[in-house]
């Protein structure tokens, strides 16, 4: 049944040592790809460290131009204190790309999504990516994270040590 739908994929190989990449699966009947690019996340303190690229796909959905960024931030391996700065680097890359889009296209429709390995209330998401959980708190440079309200209700996408995390997010 999937083959009949003619789904397509946008994908780039990333430098991740485990071979994990991100991609965007789409139906060309509804979404037309105009351009795509991959952005590396580098660690200035460790030139040998590698993680997944972040994917930017610009296209048309129902005749409207949209930008979709797909990310899979570094894991929490080694604990939050050790691994948090790596996710902050990933968030900074995402935010930099978003800022570039907004500078060129102030009314851009942007979707930032993926497995962030952090919750909606973590600093990497709130501070580095500059997201807020309530529409009324939106300011010119902020993104809206609808997943924050789910998280605050105890809804998650990952159970770990008898608690829910909401790492899989869609931010607009």
PLM features: residue spans?
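Structured beta-strand-rich core segments of catalytic domains in phosphoester-bond hydrolases
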Residues: 2-65, 71-73
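Metal-dependent phosphoesterases centered on the DNase I-like endonuclease/exonuclease/phosphatase
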Residues: 86-172
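N-terminal start-of-chain detector that recognizes signal peptides
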Residues: 29-32, 39-42, 83-84, 139-145
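Metal-dependent phosphoester/phosphodiester hydrolase catalytic core
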Residues: 62-92, 96
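Extracytoplasmic/secreted cell-surface and envelope-processing proteins
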Residues: 18-21, 77-80, 119-124
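Flexible glycine/proline-enriched surface loops and loop-helix/loop-strand junctions
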Residues: 53, 74-79, 151-154
């Amino acid at each position: 049944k999937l083959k009949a739908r003619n789904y397509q994929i946008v994908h780039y190989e990333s430098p991740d040592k485990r071979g994990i990449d991100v991609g965007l699966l789409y139906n060309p009947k509804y979404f037309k790809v105009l351009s795509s690019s991959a952005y590396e996340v580098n660690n200035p303190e460790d030139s040998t460290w590698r993680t997944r690229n972040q994917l930017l796909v610009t296209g048309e959905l129902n005749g409207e131009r949209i930008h979709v960024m797909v990310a899979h931030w570094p894991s929490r391996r080694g604990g939050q204190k050790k691994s948090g700065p790596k996710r902050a680097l990933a968030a900074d890359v995402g935010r930099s790309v978003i800022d570039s889009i907004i500078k060129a296209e102030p009314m851009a429709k942007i979707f930032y999504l993926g497995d962030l390995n952090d919750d909606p209330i973590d600093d990497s998401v709130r501070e580095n990516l500059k997201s807020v959980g309530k529409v009324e708190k939106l300011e010119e440079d902020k993104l809206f994270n609808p997943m924050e309200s789910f998280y605050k209700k105890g809804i998650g996408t990952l159970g770990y040590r008898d608690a829910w995390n909401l790492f899989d997010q869609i931010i607009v």
